[in-house]
Protein backbone atom coordinates (compact mmCIF):
# COMPACT_ATOMS: atom_id res chain seq x y z
CA UNK A 1 0.00 0.00 0.00
CA UNK A 2 1.27 3.45 -0.86
CA UNK A 3 1.61 6.39 1.51
CA UNK A 4 -1.44 8.64 1.09
CA UNK A 5 0.69 11.66 1.99
CA UNK A 6 2.95 11.02 -0.98
CA UNK A 7 -0.06 10.61 -3.28
CA UNK A 8 -1.52 13.92 -2.09
CA UNK A 9 1.80 15.77 -2.38
CA UNK A 10 2.35 14.86 -6.03
CA UNK A 11 -0.43 12.80 -7.65
CA UNK A 12 0.89 13.38 -11.18
CA UNK A 13 4.29 11.96 -10.22
CA UNK A 14 2.57 8.89 -8.75
CA UNK A 15 0.65 8.39 -12.00
CA UNK A 16 3.86 8.73 -14.03
CA UNK A 17 5.76 6.19 -11.92
CA UNK A 18 2.91 3.69 -12.13
CA UNK A 19 2.75 4.10 -15.91
CA UNK A 20 6.44 3.08 -15.93
CA UNK A 21 5.13 -0.23 -14.59
CA UNK A 22 2.81 -0.39 -17.59
CA UNK A 23 -0.21 0.11 -15.34
CA UNK A 24 -2.78 2.87 -15.84
CA UNK A 25 -3.86 3.94 -12.35
CA UNK A 26 -4.95 7.50 -13.16
CA UNK A 27 -8.59 6.79 -12.29
CA UNK A 28 -7.61 5.05 -9.05
CA UNK A 29 -5.37 7.93 -7.93
CA UNK A 30 -8.06 10.52 -8.70
CA UNK A 31 -10.73 8.52 -6.87
CA UNK A 32 -8.47 7.99 -3.86
CA UNK A 33 -7.95 11.75 -3.56
CA UNK A 34 -11.71 12.34 -3.78
CA UNK A 35 -12.46 9.72 -1.14
CA UNK A 36 -9.70 10.97 1.15
CA UNK A 37 -11.19 14.47 1.01
CA UNK A 38 -14.70 13.12 1.64
CA UNK A 39 -13.42 11.01 4.52
CA UNK A 40 -11.79 14.02 6.16
CA UNK A 41 -14.93 16.11 5.71
CA UNK A 42 -17.08 13.43 7.35
CA UNK A 43 -14.66 13.08 10.26
CA UNK A 44 -14.56 16.86 10.77
CA UNK A 45 -18.36 17.08 10.57
CA UNK A 46 -18.79 14.29 13.11
CA UNK A 47 -16.30 15.86 15.52
CA UNK A 48 -18.10 19.21 15.23
CA UNK A 49 -21.49 17.62 15.90
CA UNK A 50 -20.13 15.70 18.90
CA UNK A 51 -18.70 18.94 20.28
CA UNK A 52 -22.08 20.65 19.76
CA UNK A 53 -23.85 17.68 21.37
CA UNK A 54 -21.59 17.96 24.40
CA UNK A 55 -22.14 21.72 24.62
CA UNK A 56 -25.94 21.35 24.40
CA UNK A 57 -26.06 18.57 26.99
CA UNK A 58 -24.36 20.84 29.53
CA UNK A 59 -27.31 23.27 29.27
CA UNK A 60 -29.85 20.75 30.56
CA UNK A 61 -29.09 20.92 34.34
CA UNK A 62 -29.14 24.75 34.29
CA UNK A 63 -32.42 24.91 32.34
CA UNK A 64 -34.04 22.40 34.70
CA UNK A 65 -32.84 24.39 37.70
CA UNK A 66 -34.42 27.50 36.17
CA UNK A 67 -37.65 25.61 35.55
CA UNK A 68 -37.45 26.01 31.80
CA UNK A 69 -38.70 23.53 29.21
CA UNK A 70 -35.85 21.16 28.18
CA UNK A 71 -37.85 19.32 25.50
CA UNK A 72 -36.34 21.42 22.65
CA UNK A 73 -32.86 20.60 23.95
CA UNK A 74 -33.61 16.88 23.95
CA UNK A 75 -35.01 17.23 20.43
CA UNK A 76 -31.82 18.97 19.32
CA UNK A 77 -29.68 16.24 20.91
CA UNK A 78 -31.72 13.54 19.16
CA UNK A 79 -31.21 15.29 15.82
CA UNK A 80 -27.46 15.56 16.46
CA UNK A 81 -27.32 11.89 17.44
CA UNK A 82 -29.07 10.90 14.21
CA UNK A 83 -26.75 13.12 12.14
CA UNK A 84 -23.70 11.55 13.80
CA UNK A 85 -25.06 8.07 13.06
CA UNK A 86 -25.60 9.04 9.41
CA UNK A 87 -22.04 10.37 9.23
CA UNK A 88 -20.68 7.18 10.80
CA UNK A 89 -22.56 5.05 8.28
CA UNK A 90 -21.36 7.18 5.37
CA UNK A 91 -17.79 7.12 6.73
CA UNK A 92 -17.84 3.32 6.90
CA UNK A 93 -18.82 3.15 3.22
CA UNK A 94 -16.26 5.76 2.18
CA UNK A 95 -13.42 4.10 4.10
CA UNK A 96 -14.28 0.69 2.62
CA UNK A 97 -14.14 2.08 -0.93
CA UNK A 98 -11.01 4.08 -0.09
CA UNK A 99 -9.23 0.95 1.17
CA UNK A 100 -10.31 -1.03 -1.91
CA UNK A 101 -8.80 1.59 -4.22
CA UNK A 102 -5.63 1.87 -2.11
CA UNK A 103 -5.17 -1.91 -2.19
CA UNK A 104 -5.51 -1.86 -5.98
CA UNK A 105 -2.45 0.34 -6.49
CA UNK A 106 0.82 -1.50 -7.20
CA UNK A 107 4.08 -0.49 -5.59
CA UNK A 108 6.08 2.38 -7.03
CA UNK A 109 9.20 1.31 -8.95
CA UNK A 110 12.58 2.58 -7.80
CA UNK A 111 13.47 5.69 -9.84
CA UNK A 112 16.57 4.13 -11.45
CA UNK A 113 14.58 1.33 -13.13
CA UNK A 114 13.90 1.53 -16.84
CA UNK A 115 10.26 1.98 -17.80
CA UNK A 116 8.44 -0.73 -19.74
CA UNK A 117 8.38 -4.51 -19.76
CA UNK A 118 10.85 -7.36 -20.03
CA UNK A 119 12.23 -6.08 -23.33
CA UNK A 120 13.93 -3.37 -21.24
CA UNK A 121 15.45 -5.71 -18.65
CA UNK A 122 19.15 -5.06 -18.13
CA UNK A 123 21.73 -7.88 -17.67
CA UNK A 124 24.17 -6.68 -15.01
CA UNK A 125 26.77 -9.46 -14.90
CA UNK A 126 27.57 -12.97 -16.10
CA UNK A 127 29.29 -15.81 -14.28
CA UNK A 128 31.07 -18.74 -15.91
CA UNK A 129 30.75 -20.04 -19.45
CA UNK A 130 27.75 -21.68 -21.15
CA UNK A 131 27.86 -25.47 -21.00
CA UNK A 132 28.87 -27.24 -24.21
CA UNK A 133 28.35 -30.89 -25.21
CA UNK A 134 30.34 -33.09 -27.58
CA UNK A 135 27.29 -35.34 -27.99
CA UNK A 136 23.54 -34.89 -28.54
CA UNK A 137 22.14 -34.15 -25.04
CA UNK A 138 18.85 -35.61 -23.83
CA UNK A 139 15.88 -33.74 -22.42
CA UNK A 140 15.49 -33.97 -18.63
CA UNK A 141 12.17 -35.80 -19.03
CA UNK A 142 13.91 -38.60 -20.92
CA UNK A 143 16.92 -38.66 -18.58
CA UNK A 144 14.78 -38.76 -15.45
CA UNK A 145 12.52 -41.45 -16.89
CA UNK A 146 15.44 -43.62 -18.06
CA UNK A 147 17.19 -43.35 -14.67
CA UNK A 148 14.03 -43.81 -12.61
CA UNK A 149 14.29 -40.38 -10.98
CA UNK A 150 10.86 -38.98 -11.86
CA UNK A 151 7.57 -40.73 -12.59
CA UNK A 152 5.51 -38.34 -14.68
CA UNK A 153 2.87 -40.87 -15.71
CA UNK A 154 1.91 -41.84 -12.17
CA UNK A 155 2.09 -38.23 -11.01
CA UNK A 156 -0.51 -37.37 -13.63
CA UNK A 157 -2.58 -40.37 -12.55
CA UNK A 158 -2.59 -39.15 -8.94
CA UNK A 159 -3.21 -35.43 -9.44
CA UNK A 160 -3.52 -34.56 -13.14
CA UNK A 161 -1.27 -32.75 -15.59
CA UNK A 162 1.46 -30.64 -14.04
CA UNK A 163 2.31 -33.02 -11.21
CA UNK A 164 5.05 -35.65 -10.87
CA UNK A 165 6.51 -38.10 -8.37
CA UNK A 166 10.15 -38.08 -7.29
CA UNK A 167 11.27 -41.68 -6.97
CA UNK A 168 14.36 -43.42 -5.62
CA UNK A 169 17.51 -41.41 -6.21
CA UNK A 170 15.37 -38.67 -7.75
CA UNK A 171 13.70 -38.10 -4.39
CA UNK A 172 17.06 -38.16 -2.64
CA UNK A 173 18.57 -35.76 -5.19
CA UNK A 174 15.68 -33.33 -4.69
CA UNK A 175 16.12 -33.55 -0.93
CA UNK A 176 19.89 -33.06 -1.30
CA UNK A 177 19.28 -29.79 -3.14
CA UNK A 178 16.96 -28.55 -0.41
CA UNK A 179 19.40 -29.58 2.33
CA UNK A 180 22.25 -27.80 0.55
CA UNK A 181 20.18 -24.60 0.35
CA UNK A 182 19.09 -24.85 3.99
CA UNK A 183 22.61 -25.48 5.27
CA UNK A 184 23.87 -22.39 3.42
CA UNK A 185 21.14 -20.20 4.93
CA UNK A 186 21.74 -21.54 8.43
CA UNK A 187 25.47 -20.88 8.06
CA UNK A 188 24.61 -17.26 7.18
CA UNK A 189 22.63 -16.85 10.41
CA UNK A 190 19.11 -16.99 8.98
CA UNK A 191 16.31 -18.37 11.15
CA UNK A 192 14.53 -21.42 9.76
CA UNK A 193 10.74 -21.41 10.06
CA UNK A 194 8.20 -24.08 9.13
CA UNK A 195 4.99 -22.54 7.85
CA UNK A 196 1.37 -23.60 7.38
CA UNK A 197 0.69 -24.68 3.81
CA UNK A 198 -2.85 -23.29 4.00
CA UNK A 199 -3.36 -19.56 4.56
CA UNK A 200 -6.14 -17.07 5.19
CA UNK A 201 -7.06 -14.36 2.68
CA UNK A 202 -5.40 -11.61 4.73
CA UNK A 203 -1.97 -13.15 4.04
CA UNK A 204 -2.41 -12.72 0.30
CA UNK A 205 -3.64 -9.17 0.83
CA UNK A 206 -0.64 -8.23 3.00
CA UNK A 207 1.84 -9.69 0.49
CA UNK A 208 0.17 -7.64 -2.26
CA UNK A 209 -0.97 -10.66 -4.28
CA UNK A 210 -4.67 -10.17 -3.46
CA UNK A 211 -7.13 -9.04 -4.59
CA UNK A 212 -5.64 -8.78 -8.11
CA UNK A 213 -4.21 -12.32 -8.32
CA UNK A 214 -6.70 -14.14 -6.09
CA UNK A 215 -7.84 -16.31 -9.01
CA UNK A 216 -4.33 -17.71 -9.56
CA UNK A 217 -4.21 -19.71 -6.31
CA UNK A 218 -5.93 -22.91 -5.23
CA UNK A 219 -8.82 -21.94 -2.94
CA UNK A 220 -10.07 -24.42 -0.36
CA UNK A 221 -13.79 -25.02 0.11
CA UNK A 222 -14.87 -25.48 3.73
CA UNK A 223 -18.63 -25.72 4.34
CA UNK A 224 -18.18 -25.15 8.10
CA UNK A 225 -16.05 -22.00 7.80
CA UNK A 226 -16.90 -18.86 5.83
CA UNK A 227 -13.31 -17.59 5.85
CA UNK A 228 -11.41 -17.80 2.55
CA UNK A 229 -8.42 -20.15 2.68
CA UNK A 230 -5.96 -20.98 -0.09
CA UNK A 231 -2.94 -23.19 -0.69
CA UNK A 232 0.36 -21.39 -0.25
CA UNK A 233 1.70 -20.19 -3.66
CA UNK A 234 5.09 -19.18 -2.20
CA UNK A 235 6.48 -18.90 1.33
CA UNK A 236 6.72 -15.13 0.83
CA UNK A 237 2.93 -14.95 1.18
CA UNK A 238 3.14 -16.32 4.71
CA UNK A 239 6.46 -14.77 5.75
CA UNK A 240 5.17 -11.28 4.92
CA UNK A 241 2.42 -11.74 7.52
CA UNK A 242 4.46 -13.17 10.40
CA UNK A 243 4.79 -9.69 11.96
CA UNK A 244 1.44 -8.37 10.72
CA UNK A 245 -0.14 -5.85 13.15
CA UNK A 246 2.98 -5.83 15.32
CA UNK A 247 5.30 -3.08 16.58
CA UNK A 248 8.83 -4.50 16.67
CA UNK A 249 11.80 -3.35 18.69
CA UNK A 250 14.52 -1.71 16.62
CA UNK A 251 16.97 -4.13 18.24
CA UNK A 252 15.02 -7.07 16.74
CA UNK A 253 15.83 -5.88 13.21
CA UNK A 254 16.84 -7.15 10.78
CA UNK A 255 14.83 -10.36 11.12
CA UNK A 256 16.37 -12.77 8.62
CA UNK A 257 14.31 -15.88 7.88
CA UNK A 258 14.02 -18.72 5.40
CA UNK A 259 11.37 -21.37 4.90
CA UNK A 260 11.06 -24.55 2.87
CA UNK A 261 7.58 -25.17 1.46
CA UNK A 262 5.88 -26.87 -1.42
CA UNK A 263 4.32 -24.16 -3.59
CA UNK A 264 0.96 -24.54 -5.31
CA UNK A 265 0.21 -22.57 -8.49
CA UNK A 266 -2.64 -22.88 -10.96
CA UNK A 267 -0.34 -21.78 -13.82
CA UNK A 268 -3.27 -21.07 -16.11
CA UNK A 269 -2.74 -20.93 -19.86
CA UNK A 270 -0.87 -22.99 -22.41
CA UNK A 271 2.83 -23.77 -22.23
CA UNK A 272 5.38 -23.72 -25.00
CA UNK A 273 6.67 -26.98 -26.44
CA UNK A 274 10.08 -26.49 -24.80
CA UNK A 275 8.47 -26.18 -21.36
CA UNK A 276 7.43 -29.82 -20.98
CA UNK A 277 8.50 -31.61 -17.84
CA UNK A 278 9.27 -29.86 -14.57
CA UNK A 279 9.68 -26.27 -15.75
CA UNK A 280 6.03 -25.35 -15.20
CA UNK A 281 4.06 -27.40 -12.71
CA UNK A 282 1.24 -26.93 -10.26
CA UNK A 283 3.35 -28.02 -7.27
CA UNK A 284 7.06 -27.52 -6.71
CA UNK A 285 9.53 -27.19 -3.85
CA UNK A 286 11.15 -23.90 -2.93
CA UNK A 287 13.15 -22.29 -0.17
CA UNK A 288 12.35 -18.63 0.31
CA UNK A 289 14.60 -16.04 1.94
CA UNK A 290 12.94 -13.12 3.72
CA UNK A 291 14.13 -10.06 5.61
CA UNK A 292 12.34 -7.48 7.74
CA UNK A 293 14.64 -4.47 8.00
CA UNK A 294 15.04 -0.85 8.98
CA UNK A 295 14.20 1.45 6.02
CA UNK A 296 17.76 2.76 5.80
CA UNK A 297 19.14 -0.80 5.67
CA UNK A 298 16.95 -2.27 2.93
CA UNK A 299 19.32 -1.49 0.03
CA UNK A 300 22.11 -3.29 1.87
CA UNK A 301 19.77 -6.21 2.63
CA UNK A 302 18.80 -6.41 -1.04
CA UNK A 303 22.41 -6.77 -2.17
CA UNK A 304 22.96 -9.42 0.51
CA UNK A 305 20.03 -11.49 -0.76
CA UNK A 306 21.20 -11.19 -4.37
CA UNK A 307 24.69 -12.36 -3.39
CA UNK A 308 23.25 -15.29 -1.44
CA UNK A 309 21.17 -16.44 -4.40
CA UNK A 310 24.13 -16.08 -6.77
CA UNK A 311 26.36 -18.11 -4.44
CA UNK A 312 23.85 -20.96 -4.30
CA UNK A 313 23.80 -21.14 -8.10
CA UNK A 314 27.60 -20.87 -8.28
CA UNK A 315 27.94 -23.74 -5.81
CA UNK A 316 26.06 -26.03 -8.18
CA UNK A 317 28.43 -25.17 -11.03
CA UNK A 318 26.03 -23.22 -13.25
CA UNK A 319 26.80 -20.47 -15.70
CA UNK A 320 24.31 -17.68 -14.94
CA UNK A 321 23.52 -14.04 -15.40
CA UNK A 322 21.99 -11.50 -13.03
CA UNK A 323 19.34 -9.27 -14.59
CA UNK A 324 17.90 -5.98 -13.33
CA UNK A 325 14.20 -6.01 -14.21
CA UNK A 326 12.50 -3.06 -15.86
CA UNK A 327 9.69 -1.45 -13.89
CA UNK A 328 6.94 -3.21 -15.84
CA UNK A 329 8.47 -6.65 -15.32
CA UNK A 330 8.60 -6.28 -11.53
CA UNK A 331 5.64 -7.80 -9.72
CA UNK A 332 2.91 -5.52 -8.43
CA UNK A 333 4.25 -5.55 -4.86
CA UNK A 334 7.88 -4.87 -5.63
CA UNK A 335 9.86 -1.67 -6.07
CA UNK A 336 12.95 -3.48 -7.34
CA UNK A 337 13.79 -7.00 -8.58
CA UNK A 338 16.90 -8.79 -9.81
CA UNK A 339 16.54 -12.19 -11.47
CA UNK A 340 19.27 -14.83 -11.48
CA UNK A 341 18.94 -16.79 -14.72
CA UNK A 342 20.55 -20.02 -15.93
CA UNK A 343 20.49 -21.93 -19.19
CA UNK A 344 18.58 -25.20 -19.46
CA UNK A 345 20.03 -27.01 -22.51
CA UNK A 346 16.64 -28.25 -23.79
CA UNK A 347 15.19 -24.73 -23.66
CA UNK A 348 16.05 -21.59 -25.56
CA UNK A 349 17.71 -18.70 -23.75
CA UNK A 350 17.98 -18.06 -20.03
CA UNK A 351 15.42 -19.10 -17.40
CA UNK A 352 14.91 -17.47 -14.02
CA UNK A 353 15.79 -19.61 -10.98
CA UNK A 354 15.68 -16.86 -8.37
CA UNK A 355 13.97 -13.50 -8.05
CA UNK A 356 15.21 -11.17 -5.33
CA UNK A 357 12.95 -8.21 -4.58
CA UNK A 358 12.60 -5.19 -2.33
CA UNK A 359 9.04 -4.22 -1.43
CA UNK A 360 10.20 -1.14 0.52
CA UNK A 361 7.34 -0.28 2.95
CA UNK A 362 4.56 -1.47 0.58
CA UNK A 363 3.84 -4.80 2.32
CA UNK A 364 4.43 -3.26 5.74
CA UNK A 365 1.71 -0.68 5.13
CA UNK A 366 -0.71 -3.35 3.91
CA UNK A 367 0.04 -5.50 6.96
CA UNK A 368 0.59 -2.69 9.49
CA UNK A 369 4.11 -3.92 10.34
CA UNK A 370 6.02 -1.29 12.28
CA UNK A 371 8.94 -0.72 14.64
CA UNK A 372 9.75 1.79 17.36
CA UNK A 373 12.89 3.83 16.66
CA UNK A 374 15.10 3.85 19.73
CA UNK A 375 16.44 7.40 19.35
CA UNK A 376 13.07 9.13 19.04
CA UNK A 377 10.41 6.63 20.13
CA UNK A 378 8.70 7.26 16.79
CA UNK A 379 6.67 4.44 15.23
CA UNK A 380 7.69 3.76 11.61
CA UNK A 381 7.00 1.16 8.94
CA UNK A 382 9.62 -1.53 8.31
CA UNK A 383 10.87 -2.61 4.89
CA UNK A 384 10.43 -6.18 3.64
CA UNK A 385 12.50 -8.12 1.10
CA UNK A 386 12.34 -11.61 -0.30
CA UNK A 387 14.23 -13.91 -2.64
CA UNK A 388 14.11 -17.47 -3.92
CA UNK A 389 16.85 -19.44 -2.30
CA UNK A 390 16.16 -21.53 -4.41
CA UNK A 391 13.23 -23.18 -6.21
CA UNK A 392 14.06 -26.66 -7.49
CA UNK A 393 11.62 -26.87 -10.40
CA UNK A 394 14.17 -25.36 -12.81
CA UNK A 395 17.38 -26.12 -10.91
CA UNK A 396 16.65 -29.87 -10.95
CA UNK A 397 16.10 -30.23 -14.73
CA UNK A 398 19.00 -27.86 -15.50
CA UNK A 399 21.28 -29.85 -13.19
CA UNK A 400 20.24 -33.16 -14.73
CA UNK A 401 20.68 -31.91 -18.30
CA UNK A 402 23.98 -30.06 -17.79
CA UNK A 403 25.57 -32.90 -15.80
CA UNK A 404 24.58 -35.71 -18.18
CA UNK A 405 27.20 -37.86 -19.90
CA UNK A 406 27.10 -39.51 -23.30
CA UNK A 407 26.14 -42.87 -21.75
CA UNK A 408 23.01 -41.34 -20.17
CA UNK A 409 24.40 -41.18 -16.62
CA UNK A 410 24.43 -38.00 -14.50
CA UNK A 411 27.33 -36.58 -12.49
CA UNK A 412 26.22 -35.45 -9.02
CA UNK A 413 27.41 -31.89 -8.19
CA UNK A 414 30.16 -32.04 -5.60
CA UNK A 415 28.26 -29.95 -3.01
CA UNK A 416 25.40 -32.50 -3.01
CA UNK A 417 27.43 -35.69 -2.63
CA UNK A 418 27.58 -35.62 1.17
CA UNK A 419 23.77 -35.76 1.24
CA UNK A 420 23.80 -38.85 -0.99
CA UNK A 421 26.31 -40.93 0.94
CA UNK A 422 29.19 -39.85 -1.30
CA UNK A 423 27.46 -40.88 -4.55
CA UNK A 424 29.26 -39.29 -7.51
CA UNK A 425 27.37 -40.63 -10.55
CA UNK A 426 23.78 -41.73 -11.07
CA UNK A 427 23.69 -44.55 -13.60
CA UNK A 428 21.00 -46.71 -15.11
CA UNK A 429 20.52 -49.89 -13.12
Model region roles, listed by residue range:
Residues 126-429:
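TRNA-recognition modules of translation machinery and tRNA-sensing kinases, especially anticodon-binding
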Residues 1-131, 145, 149:
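N-terminal alpha-helical targeting/anchoring segments
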Amino acid sequence: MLDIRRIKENPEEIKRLLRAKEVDCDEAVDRILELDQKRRELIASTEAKKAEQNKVSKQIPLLKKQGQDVAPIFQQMTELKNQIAENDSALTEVEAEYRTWMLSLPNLPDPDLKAGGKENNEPLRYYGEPHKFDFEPKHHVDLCTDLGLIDYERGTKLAGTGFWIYTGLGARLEWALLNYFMDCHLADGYEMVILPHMLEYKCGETAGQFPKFADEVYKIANPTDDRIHFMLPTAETALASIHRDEILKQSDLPHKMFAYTPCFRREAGSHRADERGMVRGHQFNKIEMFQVTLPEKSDEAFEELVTKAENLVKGLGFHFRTVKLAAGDCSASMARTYDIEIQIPSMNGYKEVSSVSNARDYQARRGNIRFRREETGKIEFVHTLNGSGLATSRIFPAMVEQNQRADGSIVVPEVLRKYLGGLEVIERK
